[in-house]
Amino acid sequence: MDIKYVDYFITDNKKHVKNIYYNSFNKLERFPFWLLKKCAKENNIEFNAILNNSTIIGVEYVVKYDNVAYLMYLAIDKTKRNNGYGSKVLSDLSKKYKTIILSIERAYNNIKNEKLHRKEFYLRNGFYSTNICLYDNGVEYEILTNNENYNITKEVLKKRYIKMTNSKLIKFVISKIFNVNNIHLKNKEQLGDRIF
């Protein structure tokens, strides 16, 4: 395994990166691709194609702010999964950033499906459940982190979108698509199996 991270803008096959992104996340979870590209031109964003031996196998999108890395998107090409690539990427990110937070679609413990499989993957790779959930753009998310002692607050989560760009226009566009200013954190135990 020879994993490399190549800036999206100098990647040879941008179309493949875009296809991995679109095939890995449902419509409600996805930012418009043009918006990701626009924000990625700023210094606090890492938008990388993930390569193994010069073959594109995945994509990562990280927003950096206040000594935190928000792993907004991580996807391995569906034809390349279960080869240890995702674990290697998370290991590399954890070496680079002391505190990583991410949100995944909330998995219900009694339902074996892709959501639970994804959560188990992150837990196996050094992430912890914060037992905090939020609702954003019609999707219920659970917040995970690799730093068990990090305090997840509304302000921390609000910044994950605000720090994507310095452009007031782009911030406005983001606020119209995703829940930037109206974050309601819920403890998982309070929710039970209910969606809020």
Positions of PLM-derived features:
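Short amphipathic alpha-helix that is part of the acyltransferase structural core
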Residues: 1-34, 156-160, 176
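Conserved catalytic-core motifs of GNAT/GCN5-like acyltransferases
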Residues: 119, 123-142
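Active-site rim helix/loop that mediates acceptor-substrate recognition in acyltransferases
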Residues: 23-52
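Conserved acetyl-CoA-binding loop-helix of GNAT-fold acetyltransferases
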Residues: 76, 82-95
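Conserved GNAT acetyl-CoA-binding A-motif
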Residues: 96-113
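Conserved beta-strand in the GNAT
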Residues: 49, 54-64, 68-75
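Short hydrophobic/aromatic beta-strand element in the GNAT-like acyltransferase core
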Residues: 45-49, 59, 141-143
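C-terminal "cap" of GNAT-fold acetyltransferases
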Residues: 135-196
